[in-house]
C-alpha cells in the first residue's frame, strides 16, 4: 500500500516501523515480499483468473483451525454428495468463465485436506476441471496433500495423471508432542513415508509447510523441524506464524502456546537458514 501510494522503499520501511512498530528486519521482508508480488502481478492481464476448489474435510480438525472444515469421522456421509455437487458447480463455473471470455492461469485445490478424498473421488474432481475449463494458459495446478496420513501412492498417481504440477505436504512440525497437542493423528515417521512417495512420483514442484508458535513447541523444536524439512530438498518451504483465530481449539480450550519472544526466535532462525539453503 505504501509503495502504491507513491512512497519510496525507504519511506515505506520507515512507515511500517513508525506506525505499526514493525521491526526493521520484518519491514525489510515485507518490502521484499511486496516487490515480488508486484512483479508477478505485472504478468497478469485483466481477463486472467485463478480457480480455487475447496475440500472441507480432514482426518481430524487441528487445534489452530478455524476454516470451514469437518473431520471425516464426523461427516463421512457428507463426502459423496459434496463431491457430486462440487463437480456440478465446476461444470457451471466453467461455462460462466467461457461466456465471460476469461482465462484460467492457475488451479488450486485446497481445504481442508483434498487428499482426504478417495483416489476415485479426486479423479472425478480433476476430470471435471479438465472438461469444464480451457487449460491452455494454465501455468500451475496445485493440490494440497496437507496431511501425510492421507497420502497414498494411488492418489499421487491420480494427481500426476491429471497433470498436477505442484503438491504441498504440510507437516507443520516434526515434534511428536506438538503433533499430539494440535490434534494430528500421524507421526513424524508418516511424514517420511509421504515424502518418499511424493519423490517417487516426480512432481515438478513440492512445497512443505511449517508453523512457528504451535502449542507445546519450543525454539529448539522448531529448529529441528526446519532442519528436517531441509533434508527432503523441497522446492519451497513455507513458514507460517501461528494465527489465533476465533473458533479454534487453541482459544476455546486455552492451550499453552509459546510467547512472542520464542516465536521471534523461531522466525529469526528460519529466515537466514532458508536463505543460506538457497530459498
Label every PLM stretch briefly.
Residues 5, 275-276:
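Alpha-helix C-terminal capping/termination sites
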Residues 4-52, 100-101:
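N-terminal [4Fe-4S]-dependent radical SAM core
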Residues 48-83:
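Canonical Radical SAM [4Fe-4S] cluster-binding loop centered on the CxxxCxxC motif
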Residues 69-270, 275:
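Conserved non-cysteine loop/helix-boundary elements of the Radical SAM core domain that shape
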Residues 8-27, 52-60, 120-126, 195-209:
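Short, charge-rich amphipathic segments
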